[in-house]
Amino acid sequence: MAQGTVIRITDELFLSLLNKLEYFVEPLENYEEGGLHHTDLILRLREAVWVHRKISQVLWFPFLRRHADVITSSESKYITYTNFILYNSVNYLLDPYDRLIATCSIIIAVAELSYERGKQVFSDCSSKIFQVFFEEFLKTPFEKRGGWQYLEEYILKQRYLKWYNKKEICPNFYKTEEHLQQELKLAEYIHQMACNDFKVDFLPIKSNENEVENNEEISRLTDKVVKGLLLDP
């Protein structure tokens, strides 16, 4: 698969998703999607990622809330923490298509956090984070699975797509502290249930800053993203 294809698809995908987040920065009575001229594949992938961003971050919600200030303190920290979450979640999924959708979804979930904190400028590196992670971990199994050719067909089989237009999954950038605490308690409950089911510490969501920022593999990925951003025109 040509690298240019990956760049073109993901640049368009993330630009579209970030524009969608932008609509919710100011309260709206109604949200209408207009002026979209994407290919069917990007439209379907966009729908899947928009819904799945709520699924993929559930177990990581306590981690995101605990480290929100650090994550949105600089572009480097934003990239580092996003890579940490990706590395410690996506690679556990078996289906390459699930991995790709989860990767996009986690990146958008972190972008949503940056919008909530008024630091949406960091979300501009979303597509570059994906492209580096794709080349490192997703590309070979994704191509063996059928690549972009069969991805749309796979997405259309996912039952969670019915949630795409539901207001329940729209961003809420005006949460009260009480609302945030309720979300946190629910996420911690779900995480504990997952730990009990799998009989292991399901994900390293209790990792501290040193464990994240001093991880050599994560630092390597972050360096590649930063260098890629510097090379972009």
Residue spans for each PLM region:
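Core of folded catalytic or high-affinity ligand/protein-binding domains
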Residues: 61-148
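Terminal intrinsically disordered, low-complexity, charge-rich regions
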Residues: 1-82, 136-233
